[in-house]
Amino acid sequence: MDIQLDALLKFPHVTVESCAQQDNEVYLKLRFLNEEARCLRCEKLSSELHQNRPILIRDLSIFGQVTYLKIPRRQFYCHDCQGYFTESLTFMDAGRQYTRRYEEHLYQQVQLSSIEQVSRVERLSFDRIEGIFKHQYALKKKQDGQESSALALMKSANVKDTKTSPQ
């Protein structure tokens, strides 16, 4: 639809099909540009669309207005696995109602203030903000753990290389 909106959105293989504003809220209807998805089990591409159910998820605000994205949740059939799978999206975690960047934003805001304050500003319940915070904390802890173990492995490899290399 609008190249500028697509560029601002910064989601790969996605275009903004329509934009509507209602009661200090913005609604962007998205459409995927790719006709196929990668199977989560066998990693092969499938273009056999089984069903498409649009969902509404919250994203970062645009110009101080609450923003929602209406995205198609596509389910494909994989001939190799003989099963159905829901397309994974780079901009949101499976089963979540918010974009990753919005959840990361909320996590950062809670670190700077409190769950209560963020709850009031974002007009979300305390429990929602707390759940998002815990989810992001767990992701970051897991990521930090993986980075720490990878770093330790690299250091270990460097020590071995130093011991075995001729001097």
Where do the model's predicted regions map?
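Short flexible coil/turn linkers enriched for glycine and charged/polar residues
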Residues: 22, 112, 159-162
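Residue-level detection of the helix-turn-helix DNA-binding "recognition helix"
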Residues: 44, 123, 134, 138
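Short, amphipathic alpha-helical "recognition" segments used to contact nucleic acids or chromatin
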Residues: 98-113
